Amino acid sequence: MLHTEEDMKPGHLKTFFLPGENTRMVIVASLIGVIAGVANICFRTVLEFVHHSIFVPGYAIVSQGGWYTLLLPLIPVSGMVLLIPLAILFPGEIYGYGFTKFLRKVNIRGGSMKFRKNILKIISCSLTIGTGNSAGVEGPIAQVGGALGSAIGKIFKVSGNRTKVYTAAGCAGGVAAMFNAPIAGVFFAAEIVLLGTYEISSFSVLVVSSAMATVVSRSYYGEIPAFPIPEFHLVNPLAEIPLYMIMGVLMGLVAVLHIYIFYEVRDRFEALNISQHVKPIIGAFIIGCTAIFFPQIMGDGYHYIKDVLAGHGVIWVMAILIFLKIFATAVTLGSGGSGGVFAPALFIGSVIGGSYGSIVHNLFPSVTASSGAYAAVGLGAFLAATTHAPITAIFLLFEMTGNHLIIIPIMLTSIIGTAVASKLNADSIDTVDLTRERIDIHEGREIAIMKSIRVGKVITEEVDFISEKANVDHLLEIFQMAKDSFYFPVIDETGHMVGIISLQDVKGILHDKELRLSATVGDICTRNVLTLTPDDNIYTAMTYFDVRGIAEIPVVESPEDQWVVGMLKRRDVIDAYNREVLKKGISERSASIKLT
């Protein structure tokens, strides 16, 4: 592209040397990734501090055996007690599983969130998980990264869809740094946070942020994978592939059970008529009592996952732990503990795979791999079935193993597990509450825009009414004088609408002069009128237009009060939608310019 002398004038030099929009997005994405990587280090440092300050010395006492074992419940209870001051200082921001609320803020409210929740989330999750309660840190670190991305968006004064993308970029960076898996971080943000609705330009932001966060994490921790998975191979593909497919079905079934128990237990705790500060303590006590017999359920369970992957799991113990970990996670988060479900899902998947693999290997030792291989595939498959995010699970496992041979089994089990779980329950573990609230965050951007526009802002308030007692000839005169409207509300003596009349209604009597003179508008009008209120949205209006094949709809004060306040025209709805799309496009474009 040639630049003229005019372009080189002082007034144009500033803009000439400014980076393009895509370059600015990459710069901001890099910044988000670096900060997300640092946040991951801070998060893990605080978690390790709590763990070594409370859990390690406490468990050392309990490990002496005898009556000391009965003191184990005090360890997880101590963490919940320490949450109380935080909950009092910051009501509504400490207790419970918060990822569903996070998804609502990202996909419905544009990703705007409070910065202080970063610190609160780090502390509350560290106290919950670091003292042995059953939860994971991956969901919270995604929220922390997302909140940081949102904060950076505010600093650069971006708005609209850009804030949402930067929030997702922070999530990608947080997860990538946690697992040392940049590709999985990208798809976590794309599949789980953005629910699969993103543009190509947004995808590049996720990639850059995830990569930079991984660089920071590897610089600090090294290139050590989250789980050192042994060398994997298919002993006999023809025999093992069907076995993995069966395991995929099993993963889907258990995932549905997991989701059901998770929300059932939470609902039971919410129904308890006691102080919210007491509920997490009760939950922690239950965890501690269970851990006396099965300590593997405590915390994120990563140590036991490593044992299972190494093939050291005992069949009956792993089988019991499937249900105990499901219950323990539901109790911890359902009672008000702070944390995520990512790590528990990995734990449950590993013990399902480990126990299943032990059984099939004992039955067919010459054609199957060891139980550790099935546990490794189970890690990702159960995560996929629980979150309905198979691509994230596939890449996560691939990056953790670095073995391309694992791709085929993990693809099959993840897709089958997700398909089974989705068939039995349309919601993932993160979207159940949204469905209960009748919020559909899977809908596209177009529908979201239409639902944001109220009918009251689009209606034509100047309406020509016609009395139900008027004769048809008078109506025809009105039609002849009409310029752009051929739908007229029919009103009674009180002024309330009793029907609507259109050209379609009078076509049948146009050539019957006698009937035209004797019939009234009330005789031929449509009585069963489809109406809207000013508070309805234009998405509902367009649905009505399409179903009935009409061009105008009367707008009344309320369904009970048929007092017409205006008419809504299909073309006005389309114009309003186009204006809003243009407005959002200009807003996002302007926001990107402000980065300079």
Language-model features: where?
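Bateman (tandem CBS) regulatory domains
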Residues: D440, K451-D464, A470-D473, D505, ...
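The conserved cystathionine-beta-synthase
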Residues: I466-D484, I491, L510-L517, T531-S558, ...
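Conserved structured catalytic cores and adjacent interaction surfaces
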Residues: I586
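Alpha-helical transmembrane segments and immediately membrane-proximal extracytoplasmic
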Residues: M1-S452, G456-K457, E461-E462, S467-I478, ...
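Short aromatic/basic micro-patch
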Residues: I449-S452, I500, T531, M567
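Short hydrophobic beta-strand motif reused across regulatory alpha/beta modules
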Residues: F187, G499-V506, V565-V573
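Residue-level signal for well-ordered, solvent-exposed loop/turn and beta-edge residues enriched
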Residues: H496, D561-W563
